[in-house]
Amino acid sequence: MDDNSLKEYKTKLGNLSVNDKKMRDLYLRKLALGEIQGPPTGYASIDKPWLKHYSEDQILKDFEPMSVYQLMYNRNIEHDNEVAIEYFGNKITYGNLLKKIDLTAKSLLELGVKKGDVVLISMPNTPEAEYLFYAVNKIGAVANCIDPRSGIESFNDEINNFNIKFYFGVDVIYDKIKNISSDIKIINISVFDSMPIVIKQIAKLKNKEPIIDSRTIKWNDFLKLGKKSTINSIKAEYEANKLSAIVHTGGTTGTPKGVMLTNEEMNGLIYQMMYGYSEFKRGQKFLNFMPTFIALGLNNSTHLSACFGLHSVMIPSFEPEDMPELLLKYKPNIFLCGPMHLPIIMRNEKVKKADLSFLEIICSGGEKLPLNIQESFQQFLKEHNAPANMWIGYGATETSAGIACMKNNCFKFESVGVPYLKNNISLYDTELEEEIRGYNKSGEIRINAPTIMNGYSGKNANETDDVISIDEFNNKWYHTGDIGHLSEDGLIYIDGRIKQIIMRKAFKIYPQIIEKIILKHPAVKSCAVVGVSDEEEFRIPVANIVLKPNFLGNKEIEKSVIDYVDNIINDELPEYCSMAGYNFLEKLPLTPIGKVDFKSLEKIGIINGKKRKLVKSKFSIN
């Protein structure tokens, strides 16, 4: 298909009605399954080979526009007695959850919060955080969720950006927060407020409450406003394409940005999960430790859990080392995790002896899951009677946390799964700025989806156009910045990030290729290859390696790893891929949300300060 024919064909597709697009998707599904014959174009965004993994009924589903509160309400109004939240043993039913949200909504109105106001919320994972999110949404206001660990400057930026008048936050940061603008009403919330009485009393004896000023009120006093209210009922507010929440990016390669999400964008992910994944069932127990100030926590954990009618076990404070104990204590059917959690689980002596048949869905996300860990954990699950497969998911804050995920009917190691039901994917050559034709060819992953953000907020607003483009048919495309490829079956594979590509002189080095080599050494626990500035070569690759505990500090093992990597590069890769330096660390630095902090690693440089010479390889460029 030449350029003119392709353009004409795309124009024809762009002018199809909504119903005609569905009919075409059914045709593409049959084409991908081999049920009918026809000439595919070779362009992923046109052929959509991933549709073979969805049923005809799923493809024909529509999304009903409504607020996030209304969707959650509709899904649970007839399930009053089922458990919605478990918090330190205190179980809150869906009936009580809806009542708590109503009371919170009345209290917000009595406090003076109005439709369209932005409310600043800085909370760990507690029931109050969930009540607030849905109550704020119910009255037509916007929840701006910010990490409690943020500096006071970040809080003031949000206050100034949105003219915020109301702040709800955890009391342990009150000494910091009391210095914000004097015009702000502060509501202090304790992580103990929803604990069972005995646990609450013990916890309060061990922890002093902060002394508050006159403009600050406690959560329970705030709720008294709603109890005294003369408002009988509150109609759920909904207006198309209005903001529902602001969450913040993880800041792995820069400072966190505020991401504005609408009701449609947040619900878009939930609808796609509801219609595309039969593995989720009402009443399943979900281990919920992702914080609500990130999209993965607010949308893909809290909102998803409530809309699916799951039994959400809320964990307000979490360290990776806690995972084995939490698994054995609560026996969840579902949990989301990061790659760092899996080795900790496999090493734990109690878990090694446990029956894990309760585990039905496990999904790793946030960053790439090394193949050796995925294979090991899949085998570990099998040996411990768990029916779950080790899924990998793929998303971004800018897409309401979701782009793609594995399904049990298309499970493949290293793949991050198939695009969600209504998503479209294209692979782009960023130098030629054109879509790549064919499969298993690397390019930038771009996504058209109902979940793409409204835009960045505040001082980052002008960066929105850097990552979102609008095509000639008014379709919004998010440029992920990830390099990946698509298989003929429509499965996505991540090869790296554009920002992490290392330009050494005129040559591109993809860090994940080197990281795969390093991780194959039996003494290596984890690693990250980063580019470090260099006057002669622009950027040079440096490997940061963490050895397994019994090898830490062993110089002979360190040398064996270096020799191993050098030899493979010499045999299999061009010489410009040879490492300019090796750093052996006790652990990799992490961002506040647990991702590898590449900026910190770049600043470390080469610890001994000695840049290694190029290792001459069989593919020498000189």
Language-model features and meaning:
Residues 418-422, 433-470, 507-509:
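Conserved ATP/PPi-binding loop(s) of AMP-dependent carboxylate-activating enzymes
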Residues 140, 267-285, 293-336, 344-349:
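Conserved AMP-binding/adenylation subdomain of ANL enzymes
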Residues 209-248, 255, 279-285:
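Conserved pre-ATP/AMP-binding loop-to-beta segment of ANL
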Residues 333-337, 346-413, 424:
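Gly/Ser/Thr-rich phosphate-binding loop
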Residues 129, 150, 167-169, 335, ...:
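AMP-binding/adenylate-forming catalytic core of the ANL superfamily
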Residues 502, 528-533, 542-546, 565-622:
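Conserved C-terminal "lid"/linker of ANL adenylate-forming enzymes
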Residues 93-95, 235, 244-271:
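Conserved AMP-binding A3 loop
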Residues 81-112, 117-126, 130-134, 151-156, ...:
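Conserved AMP-binding/adenylate-forming core of the ANL superfamily
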